C-alpha cells in the first residue's frame, strides 16, 4: 500500500461517515445541509443514482429526479460534509454502470425494474486504518 492510499484511508476513518452500499439504478434519498442566510436546514433530495465516479476520498455519485416535469441531476461527493445522510429506498436491476440513457427517456421507458435478490444492506462503517 502506498502513502497516498494510506492517507486516504486514514482520512476516511477520521470522517467516520456511515455510507450505505448503493449502486447505479438504486433510488436514494440524500439529506443535504442547505445554508439559507444565517441558518442551515436539511433538505431531502430523492432520485435514481445514475452513476458513481472515482474512488477513495474523491468518490462522487450522480442522482437524477424529475421535478415539475423537468429532469434535474445533482452530483454529490460521497464524503462531503454537506451530506447529512444517505438512505437507499429501493434497489434497481440494471445492466450498466452509467445510466445516462435515462436522460433521453420519458414515462414508462424510464422505469427501472426493482431487484428482489437482496434487500437494502445495513449501513457499513468505514474501514479502520491499519
UniProtKB/Swiss-Prot annotation:
One of its GO terms (cellular component) is cytosolic large ribosomal subunit. The keyword Cytoplasm does not apply. It comes from the Bacteria. GO terms for biological process: translation. InterPro entries: Ribosomal_bL19, Ribosomal_bL19_CS, Ribosomal_bL19_sf, Translation_prot_SH3-like_sf. One of its GO terms (molecular function) is structural constituent of ribosome. It holds the Pfam family Ribosomal_L19. The keyword Ribosomal protein applies. Keywords: Ribonucleoprotein, Ribosomal protein. NCBIfam families: rplS_bact. Belongs to the bacterial ribosomal protein bL19 family. This protein is located at the 30S-50S ribosomal subunit interface and may play a role in the structure and function of the aminoacyl-tRNA binding site. This is Large ribosomal subunit protein bL19. It comes from Methylorubrum populi (strain ATCC BAA-705 / NCIMB 13946 / BJ001).
